[in-house]
Amino acid sequence: SARGTLVMVGGGVGCWYVSKEQEWHREWLSGQPFTLRWVAGNHEDYDMLAERPVGEWHGGKVQYIKENVIHLMRGQVYELDGIRLFAFGGARSHDIHGGILDPDDPDFRKKYQALRRAGAWFRVNHVSWWKEEMPDEAEFEEGRRNLERAGWQVDFIVTHCTASSTQALAGGILYQPDTLTDYLEEIRQKCQYRKWFFGHYHDNRNVTEKDLML
């Protein structure tokens, strides 16, 4: 079919806060002759994602944003025409040194304006930041179980951030190891894979022969 062409995005698509602009983008994507698959980044609207029903696609859990716009959920292994893919979205935001503001705080506007004047990096809870950007232990365990069932062998891995050792090569001093990059390092050490695709670091290059930053 025309939608047999698959396009993969390694997170950070900004899905999908409520606005006319976002609705236009969703409708535009739904009319394209391809299927867009993506893993969550650290700037998705996780409140909205939580409202989406969970379905099944090629052996793993997914959420359909549109018929051809598919969120690949954390820790899932998918099999497509003999190709095995492991997906694990999420990343820790690095642009929050100024803090996370609570919009219900009586002093919110004063704090917001002060941080803006100072040029600080900050975000607003449930508006531009969600704690669900980082996985919980249940998601880590689900990934391990699914990889165990796959014999720790896949063709491709798609994530938003990457394993700690790869991040050290790719990201510079701005990005420090955390529980997710350490988990992905565990995956990197145990899993046999052909290529690992990831985003998050705002560059496009081969970090190693097998690890590709997009």
Which residues are covered by each model-predicted region?
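Charge-rich, low-complexity terminal tails
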Residues: 180, 195-208
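Short glycine-/acidic-enriched loop or helix-start segments at secondary-structure transitions
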Residues: 18-20, 47-50, 97, 166-169, ...
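Proline-aspartate-enriched helix->loop->beta-strand connector
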Residues: 154-159, 192-198
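Short, electropositive alpha-helical surface patch
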Residues: 174-178, 208-214
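Active-site-proximal loop/helix segment associated with metal-binding centers of metalloenzymes
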Residues: 67, 81-174
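Short loop/helix-cap segments at secondary-structure boundaries that form the rim of catalytic
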Residues: 78-80, 204-211
